[in-house]
Amino acid sequence: MRSARLGRLLWMLFITEIQAATELPEEKYILAEGETLNVNCPVTVGVYSNSRKAWQKLNRNGKFQTLAITERVSGQVSKVQVGKIFLTDEPSEGMLHVQMTNVQAEDSGLYRCVIYQPPKDPIILFYPVRLVVTNYSSGTPASAETPTQSCSPTTTLPPTTTTNRHRPRPRTVRTVTQFLTDFTTSLSSPGLKVTLTNVTDITRDTEISLILPAVCGLLSKSLVFIVLFVVTRMSFTP
């Protein structure tokens, strides 16, 4: 009886550890009401170029709800607008651009961009995005961690679009992805025409880096479970 209870306890612990190991880190964006969220999701060129992409949000029931879906257009740029959500799929560049304008407090939550392929499960393209919308104005800092003091008069500036106001994490993969995002944004000014040649390699490295930690975590948890199981069997063997 004791061995059966211990076995069930070990199994529950094993399942919990597996779920924790397979969870992806989040990208956090902190915006004020009325600002615009911009997210660039890398797509593997030649693999998912012609696949439909979607922007989803986690609802209160714990399930992701599809907010907008792109059309399947072979080799061409696809643009879709659903309310204040804009999706731009650029197959040649291997990038899905997501834009949400005039964000409000109720827009706060967890989002993700995926390959949309029902009835199959969607394929996550990028880190889940955690959006936090505050009620601060555009001229007020969204966080109290970096206060500024000034004795001179201040000038109120018109609202601006904030594309990437989040705290960077010390991860190599995220640094590469963020570099690609900032580089793409900085080259989006009118009159500039630049061809990116290494997008495929970066997106492939991103996918490998997403899968490799989950596999390593699963293998490590399996090894722990096997050792615990052997020790349990030996302790109850007469």
UniProtKB/Swiss-Prot annotation:
Transmembrane is among the record's keywords: yes
Extracellular-side segments: 21-210
Biased composition (Low complexity): 146-163
Glycosylated residues, chain numbering: N135, N198
One GO term of the biological process aspect: innate immune response
Signal peptide: 1-20
Membrane topology: Single-pass type I membrane protein
Stretches that traverse the bilayer: 211-231
Matches recorded under InterPro entries: Ig-like_dom, Ig-like_dom_sf, Ig-like_fold, Ig_sub, Ig_V-set
UniProt-recorded Gene Ontology molecular function terms: scaffold protein binding; transmembrane signaling receptor activity
Cytoplasmic face residues: 232-238
Disulfide bonds, paired cysteine numbers: C41-C113
KW Transmembrane (keyword) present: yes
UniProt subcellular location: Cell membrane
Annotated PROSITE patterns: IG_LIKE (PS50835)
Primary location group: membrane
GO cellular component, as recorded: cell surface; plasma membrane
Sorted UniProt keywords: Adaptive immunity, Cell membrane, Disulfide bond, Glycoprotein, Immunity, Immunoglobulin domain, Innate immunity, Membrane, Receptor, Signal, Transmembrane, Transmembrane helix
Region (Disordered) residue spans: 141-169
Domain (Ig-like V-type) ranges: 21-129
Subunit structure: Monomer. Homomultimer; when activated. Interacts with TYROBP/DAP12. Interacts with TLR4.
The protein's role, per its UniProt record: Cell surface receptor that plays important roles in innate and adaptive immunity by amplifying inflammatory responses. Upon activation by various ligands such as PGLYRP1, HMGB1 or HSP70, multimerizes and forms a complex with transmembrane adapter TYROBP/DAP12. In turn, initiates a SYK-mediated cascade of tyrosine phosphorylation, activating multiple downstream mediators such as BTK, MAPK1, MAPK3 or phospholipase C-gamma.
Classification via PANTHER family: TRIGGERING RECEPTOR EXPRESSED ON MYELOID CELLS 1
Protein's UniProt name: Triggering receptor expressed on myeloid cells 1
Species, as recorded: Sus scrofa (Pig)
